[in-house]
């Protein structure tokens, strides 16, 4: 889709990609506990076309389907991936002219990667450290946390720490939950952004319980840009 390139990599006697060089340095204050890519999300004009592409070319399966609506925008999303669950690729399609997906397609001049989700072992410390380094995240209203204990149940993290870091929480299984937060777009146009995500137990979802709060946060940014 768009200018996206898929690379096949076989590692043999290498720590990473050919030509990779480990540069010294990094974050001097705080700790950023990023581990690996959790999933990559695509925004496209025709979702089913690319779901079929991944099924026929890569042998992936469709593993989830979402139809999300707010008062002002909407999207449809299907998730494809391998049988083992190592690869997860949600694919979004706009279902309204003023949706965040349509805005992305307009600004990006076509289909492309909407966001990259990075897995962390400690999202509170990671988000705090990234903010100290200048990262900007979407804002979460304090009211989001009023019903959090009753909605997600007991979690290992301290709720006050989660609230101070403005992290979202969702329980997608009885024995699994996730914490997540999204950056603002990293370029001057509303295109690519990052997600920081932490999973506990057998969590395999994408924060479906947070979609309403996430959409409202994105729509606030769209209002600032005059997109809606």
Where are these regions (language model features)?
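Glyoxalase I/VOC metalloenzyme domain signal
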Residues: 1-62, 72-228
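Active-site and NAD+-binding cores of ADP-ribose-processing enzymes
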Residues: 65-67
């Amino acid at each position: 889709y768009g200018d996206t390139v898929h690379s096949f990599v076989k590692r043999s006697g290498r720590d990473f990609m050919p030509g990779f060089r480990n540069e010294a340095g990094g974050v001097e204050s705080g700790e950023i506990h990023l581990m690996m890519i959790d999933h990559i999300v695509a925004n496209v004009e025709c979702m089913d076309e690319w779901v079929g592409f991944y099924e026929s070319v890569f042998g992936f399966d469709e593993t989830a389907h979402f139809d999300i609506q707010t008062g002002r925008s909407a999207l449809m999303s299907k998730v494809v991936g391998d049988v083992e669950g190592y690869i997860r690729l949600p694919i979004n399609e706009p279902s309204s002219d003023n949706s965040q997906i349509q805005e992305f397609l307009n600004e990006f001049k076509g289909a492309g990667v909407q966001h990259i989700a990075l897995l962390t072992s400690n999202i509170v410390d990671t988000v705090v450290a990234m903010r100290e380094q200048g990262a900007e995240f979407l804002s979460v209203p304090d009211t989001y946390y009023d019903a959090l204990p009753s909605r997600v149940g007991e979690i290992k993290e301290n709720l006050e720490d989660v609230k101070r870091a403005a992290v979202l929480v969702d329980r997608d299984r009885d024995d699994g939950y996730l914490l997540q937060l999204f950056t603002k777009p990293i370029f001057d146009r509303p295109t690519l952004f990052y997600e920081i995500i932490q999973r506990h137990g057998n969590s395999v979802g994408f924060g479906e319980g947070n979609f309403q709060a996430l959409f409202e946060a994105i729509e606030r940014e769209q209002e600032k840009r005059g997109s809606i």
